[in-house]
Amino acid sequence: MSLLARLEQSVHENGGLIVSCQPVPGSPMDKPEIVAAMAQAAASAGAVAVRIEGIENLRTVRPHLSVPIIGIIKRDLTGSPVRITPYLQDVDALAQAGADIIAFDASFRSRPVDIDSLLTRIRLHGLLAMADCSTVNEGISCHQKGIEFIGTTLSGYTGPITPVEPDLAMVTQLSHAGCRVIAEGRYNTPALAANAIEHGAWAVTVGSAITRIEHICQWFSHAVRR
């Protein structure tokens, strides 16, 4: 059975929770062994896949995990706003470190490497692809290229103001267009995750609400202030 078929079966049987194990950069939790522990805990609690950033983290997580890993590399570039897996060598490094699925910024912004070239390199390694999109048009374009997973990852993050609520309308429109939608971005409660599924998402990625202790503590700290 192919990886995609196994993942489809897992989503059908266990629900579509994907956990993004990305600690706050530079925080006490930002260590590969802690990221690996987070990933193992998430998988044991029902996550059908995990999303891991960085080669060292990925190499540490891979031996301990049987569920699929979505791999990314984040960079801060001077000549482009694109941050997620911008280079061909990033794809190569993620493949060699054990990623099953490689996600990349698929927005229609200035970029060092075009989407088709990134997709071709992912296919060269025999891996699945995920397009992190900011708009419906970007998602449909990537779906038409044969990209397996269309994420709403960048919705609300390419403009000056980030909304509080997730973009459920984008989920609905992409689902109606036939995309295998991974809802991602501001799904920080079980109710919002359930709403994404109700709006047609194939799976939902949750990050900060599960793996960023600093964010969770701040939510509670602000709530109990007098």
Curated annotation (Swiss-Prot):
Keyword Isomerase found: yes
CDD domains according to UniProt: NanE (cd04729)
UniProt GO BP: carbohydrate metabolic process; N-acetylmannosamine catabolic process; N-acetylneuraminate catabolic process
Catalytic activity of the protein: an N-acyl-D-glucosamine 6-phosphate = an N-acyl-D-mannosamine 6-phosphate
Gene3D superfamilies recorded: Aldolase class I
Residues annotated as transmembrane: none
UniProt KW keywords: Carbohydrate metabolism, Isomerase
Pathway: Amino-sugar metabolism; N-acetylneuraminate degradation; D-fructose 6-phosphate from N-acetylneuraminate: step 3/5
InterPro entries: Aldolase_TIM, NanE, RibuloseP-bd_barrel
EC annotation from Swiss-Prot or TrEMBL: 5.1.3.9
Pfam family, one: NanE
Cellular component, GO annotation: cytosol
GO MF term (any one): N-acylglucosamine-6-phosphate 2-epimerase activity
NCBIfam families: PRK01130.1
Family that this chain belongs to: Belongs to the NanE family.
Family annotation (PANTHER family): N-ACETYLMANNOSAMINE-6-PHOSPHATE 2-EPIMERASE-RELATED (PTHR36204:SF1)
Job of this protein: Converts N-acetylmannosamine-6-phosphate (ManNAc-6-P) to N-acetylglucosamine-6-phosphate (GlcNAc-6-P).
Protein name according to UniProt: Putative N-acetylmannosamine-6-phosphate 2-epimerase 1
